[in-house]
Amino acid sequence: MTEILSPMAGRIQEVNIEAGQTITEDDELFIVEAMKMENVVYGDPGVVKEVLVKAGDDVEEDQVLAIVE
């Protein structure tokens, strides 16, 4: 099981995954905006077990965004 972490504090702009979805290492999972800069979050290949945030949520650095098996 792998935790997908936020690279920085900011706001979730996009959530591009849902539970049960199979992802690859090139998939853009989330977009986190901080100080008007957008940062794309990628993850390890696997199946999304749970998504813990939604668009508009404020997140902290290293906060768990999703769990992938």
Give the ranges of each region predicted by the language model:
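Short beta-strand-turn/beta-hairpin segments enriched in glycine/proline and small hydrophobics
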Residues: 1-11, 28-45
